[in-house]
């Protein structure tokens, strides 16, 4: 009888908890932008899986708790926030987990315009902020870490052009050039205010501050920073140093990277021949100089051989890509002495009937994967690659000519998953709930 009373008491307690959750954390409906339905808001940090921070030791990443090496197989889905669909974001993160992927790079910004996160300088949409909360919360539930980018060089979703427009509207004296983003005090203050709002945000689901959230792998200062005028290069370099130091002043838990494409500047003249063309040296980007900044923890590189070399044969693109990757691996290991991530690796999906895009993409991806795996075996600087970009059904409006629904491309799906397997077998790190099903 006493055992039955205890059982009834336990059942009553569980029922009470259920009523409290349904009362205080009701289903919240999708904010629009791509379907999705609703989701239940459960701010219970003790339900989150334990996850250590990612850290850096010399030229490679480590588990901050154990010191074990971390090598990344990841992907880009920039649209997780702008889609404003928790259901689609959750599905993408689940699919990433099924492939053994460990890091997703996505945008943590949406500046101005309809449905923006930052409506105007320092003014935010709480509803959109809660979408970002959910993305981070759901990433941790799936043992995925996020690289969160803080602003765009491009005009997409606002970018630095929106900051310039805001400053001009406020009466700031400046030219129309978006290069003002890197040097004008008003714009730099806007950016710092935004960074502070993001880093000090307390997640409405987990109640964990972003700066204390281990599911965040790193902060990226800008997506593909470039200048209009080559004379603005020193301003970009100073901006990187200032903003990296500012991020670190607010958050010592997380890694910081610039977000560069990896183009070489005039600092080391013999490297200019590694660029895809003379045009690349005129964009102010200088891979070595930008990445050498004290508070930058790792270098970033992009790889788009098809769009960078549109007239080249596949054989020429393969040869170029191999040299591009090798050069950045060697410079990161020997000069920078920092890890390097190939944070975007993409190949155009041609629509013509004679195109062999999937096969060509797999060839390009395999080159990068093999070089990363070889680096991982040697505990060297090549620390991972992230395909651009993965989608799920219902996100076509956020796609581009590089987008892939992986399960619709069996060869690509297998290639991505096999890379996850290879890296897991080396050091056994990553999602403890994911086991490779591909025989060695």
Swiss-Prot record:
Top enzyme category: hydrolase
Could you list the residue ranges that cross the membrane?
A: none
Pfam families given in the database record: Cellulase
* Alphabetic keyword roster: Glycoprotein, Glycosidase, Hydrolase, Secreted, Signal
Active-site residues from the entry: 224, 344
Signal peptide region = 1-22
Q: Which molecular-function annotations from GO does this UniProt entry contain?
A: mannan endo-1,4-beta-mannosidase activity
Task: State its location(s).
Answer: Secreted
Q: Which family does it belong to?
A: Belongs to the glycosyl hydrolase 5 (cellulase A) family.
Q: What is this protein called?
A: Mannan endo-1,4-beta-mannosidase 6
Q: Which organism is it from?
A: Oryza sativa subsp. japonica (Rice)
What gene does this protein come from?
A: MAN6
